[in-house]
Amino acid sequence: MQKYEKLEKIGEGTYGTVFKAKNRETHEIVALKRVRLDDDDEGVPSSALREICLLKELKHKNIVRLHDVLHSDKKLTLVFEFCDQDLKKYFDSCNGDLDPEIVKSLLFQLLKGLGFCHSRNVLHRDLKPQNLLINRNGELKLADFGLARAFGIPVRCYSAEVVTLWYRPPDVLFGAKLYSTSIDMWSAGCIFAELANAGRPLFPGNDVDDQLKRIFRLLGTPTEEQWPAMTKLPDYKPYPMYPATTSLVNVVPKLNATGRDLLQNLLKCNPVQRISAEEALQHPYFSDFCPP
């Protein structure tokens, strides 16, 4: 740990405390994530270490770089590239108004990062505005990629903050255990709507039941034909047959027609029907977009 000088505590993440620090040799600013390990645990599980070391190979401009893994008997510290703020803080600073071109650019970068990881069979599983980081050049980077697989998706942060369900798809809310890349695509859809509404969450549920009701009230309760596997999920229970909202115009008023179409393709209750990151990047919504 002598290699890094701690500057200040940034906050409590899902897995532990995060510090801003400086590399004593290069003077580079980094983020140190001290992963909390259970006291009764035998130190760091080897499976977690294997997963984490794989993440060092994820090199992409829209993924937060994992520079280093510092491991002692009871402590695991992950050294990440430093970014100035997360998307949640960014929303707070834009006062309820976000330019449609910025929305498009941020979604494009989110999908680029997702596409890269998905092509390497790495899922995020816990995407939300708090782990989308933005640096001072306006570049968006996905943080905490793959940590959910290494450490499990926690039910609550150890700081007692409940891990949000707002970005979880219906299949996961119904107890699906076999995840595919579609879990991240649903979350991307929720974040897209939140971008379009300058920070207003699409489905701010209070618990699993409320979360599913909010989803079905907007998208319609799926029928057996629309989603045959739904009734087989471990925690499935029937919901009232809500009709789908005829148009998303009132839901995302600032989003144009092609944007609404892309959103509808991301927010499919049946995971099999959800668009992939690669397909989303080819969507007409981006036809007039020139990446910087």
Curated annotation (Swiss-Prot):
Modification N6-acetyllysine, positions: K56
SUPFAM superfamilies (UniProt xref): Protein kinase-like (PK-like) (SSF56112)
GO cellular component: axon; cell junction; cyclin-dependent protein kinase holoenzyme complex; cytoplasm; cytosol; dendrite; filopodium; glutamatergic synapse
Tissue: Expressed in hippocampal neuronal synaptic termini (at protein level). Expressed predominantly in post-mitotic neurons of the central and peripheral nervous system.
InterPro entries found in the cross-reference section: CDK, Kinase-like_dom_sf, Prot_kinase_dom, Protein_kinase_ATP_BS, Ser/Thr_kinase_AS
Annotated ranges, domain Protein kinase: 4-286
Record PTM: Phosphorylation on Tyr-15 by ABL1 and FYN, and on Ser-159 by casein kinase 1 promotes kinase activity. By contrast, phosphorylation at Thr-14 inhibits activity.
Catalytic residues (UniProt): D126
Modified residues (Phosphothreonine): T17
Gene Ontology biological process terms from the UniProt entry: apoptotic process; associative learning; axon extension; axonogenesis; behavioral response to cocaine; calcium ion import; cell division; cell migration
Entry keywords, A to Z: Acetylation, Apoptosis, ATP-binding, Biological rhythms, Cell cycle, Cell division, Cell membrane, Cell projection, Cytoplasm, Kinase, Membrane, Neurodegeneration, Neurogenesis, Nucleotide-binding, Nucleus, Phosphoprotein, Serine/threonine-protein kinase, Synapse, Transferase
Entry-annotated residues carrying Phosphotyrosine: Y15
Quaternary structure annotation from Swiss-Prot or TrEMBL: Heterodimer composed of a catalytic subunit CDK5 and a regulatory subunit CDK5R1 (p25) and macromolecular complex composed of at least CDK5, CDK5R1 (p35) and CDK5RAP1 or CDK5RAP2 or CDK5RAP3. Only the heterodimer shows kinase activity. Under neurotoxic stress and neuronal injury conditions, p35 is cleaved by calpain to generate p25 that hyperactivates CDK5, that becomes functionally disabled and often toxic. Found in a trimolecular complex with CABLES1 and ABL1. Interacts with CABLES1 and CABLES2. Interacts with AATK and GSTP1. Binds to HDAC1 when in complex with p25.
Function: Proline-directed serine/threonine-protein kinase essential for neuronal cell cycle arrest and differentiation and may be involved in apoptotic cell death in neuronal diseases by triggering abortive cell cycle re-entry. Interacts with D1 and D3-type G1 cyclins. Phosphorylates SRC, NOS3, VIM/vimentin, p35/CDK5R1, MEF2A, SIPA1L1, SH3GLB1, PXN, PAK1, MCAM/MUC18, SEPT5, SYN1, DNM1, AMPH, SYNJ1, CDK16, RAC1, RHOA, CDC42, TONEBP/NFAT5, MAPT/TAU, MAP1B, histone H1, p53/TP53, HDAC1, APEX1, PTK2/FAK1, huntingtin/HTT, ATM, MAP2, NEFH and NEFM.
Similarity comment: family membership: Belongs to the protein kinase superfamily. CMGC Ser/Thr protein kinase family. CDC2/CDKX subfamily.
Designated name of the protein: Cyclin-dependent kinase 5
Biological source species: Rattus norvegicus (Rat)
Gene: Cdk5
